[in-house]
């Protein structure tokens, strides 16, 4: 078996605001700073709203500009 072909597996810190999570990874820097809290993602927390639209002005502007388009989906009659 060849030696030293596998990346180093070491402690990895995930920083979200004031919280720090520790795990293991082969990532070269040893830490990552997250600007969006993954715990507030609408897939896991329906009360949080749409995190992407709140934090990214370009996405928000796009959604405002093209909000009336259906992109092929049919709208239900009310």
Swiss-Prot record:
A Gene Ontology BP annotation from the UniProt entry: translation
Keyword flag RNA-binding: yes
Statement: the UniProt record of this protein carries the keyword Ribosomal protein: yes
Gene3D superfamilies reported in the protein's UniProt record: Ribosomal protein L31 (4.10.830.30)
Cellular component, GO, one term: ribosome
Alphabetical UniProt keywords: Ribonucleoprotein, Ribosomal protein, RNA-binding, rRNA-binding
SUPFAM superfamilies reported in the protein's UniProt record: L28p-like
Pfam family, one: Ribosomal_L31
Molecular function terms from GO: rRNA binding; structural constituent of ribosome
Superkingdom of the organism of origin: Bacteria
Functional summary from the UniProt entry: Binds the 23S rRNA.
Assembly mode: Part of the 50S ribosomal subunit.
Assigned protein family: Belongs to the bacterial ribosomal protein bL31 family. Type A subfamily.
Name of this protein: Large ribosomal subunit protein bL31
Source organism of the structure: Rickettsia conorii (strain ATCC VR-613 / Malish 7)
Gene that this polypeptide is encoded by: rpmE
């Amino acid at each position: 078996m060849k030696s030293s072909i596998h990346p180093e597996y070491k402690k990895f810190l995930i920083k979200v605001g004031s919280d720090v999570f520790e795990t293991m990874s082969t990532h070269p820097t040893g830490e990552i700073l997250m600007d969006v809290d993954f715990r507030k993602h609408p897939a896991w927390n329906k009360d949080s709203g749409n995190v992407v639209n709140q934090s990214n002005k370009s996405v928000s502007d796009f959604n405002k500009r093209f909000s009336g388009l259906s992109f092929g989906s049919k709208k239900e009659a009310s």
